[in-house]
């Protein structure tokens, strides 16, 4: 198979989320992992940083199954933030920076970098994340 992408181009870019005013993700946001399909929508994790301090935290977004450019819900508070010493102290302090997630038997495994020094894995129950998002957490 030919893997030459020389003549390919991005056809359309759509902004899905951005920083929010006066929140934990007010300075910048970025994707943390590919979205995972659930019965309620695509679950997407992202990292965010506030303007008041340089702490990297993790939020969740639920996207429409048929049109993943539509945000159905977004976590008001971070679902994961630096707590352990190895997340708070390292090359860059106060960082949890997810790069992937896997769902297995109802548990979400979030693989992340901690303080740019270690690689870790955190777990959360999928139904708890989805319930929180579906219960009206702000967009």
Predicted features, each with a name:
Residues 94:
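Short, flexible loop/turn motifs enriched in small residues
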Residues 1-27, 36-91, 105-108, 112-139:
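Beta-rich carbohydrate-recognition and catalytic domains
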Residues 31-34, 97-100:
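Beta-propeller and closely related beta-sheet repeat lectin domains
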């Amino acid at each position: 198979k030919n893997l030459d992408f020389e003549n390919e181009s991005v056809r359309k870019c759509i902004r899905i989320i951005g920083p929010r005013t006066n929140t934990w993700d007010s300075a910048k946001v970025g994707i943390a992992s590919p979205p995972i399909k659930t019965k309620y929508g695509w679950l997407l994790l992202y990292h965010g940083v506030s303007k008041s301090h340089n702490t990297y935290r993790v939020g969740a977004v639920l996207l429409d199954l048929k049109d993943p450019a539509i945000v159905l819900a977004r976590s008001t508070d971070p679902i994961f933030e630096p707590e352990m010493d190895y997340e708070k102290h390292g090359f860059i302090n106060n960082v949890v920076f997810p790069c992937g997630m896997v769902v297995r038997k109802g548990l979400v495994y979030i693989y992340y970098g901690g303080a740019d020094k270690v690689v870790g894995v955190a777990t959360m129950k999928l139904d708890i994340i989805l319930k929180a998002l579906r219960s009206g957490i702000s967009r």
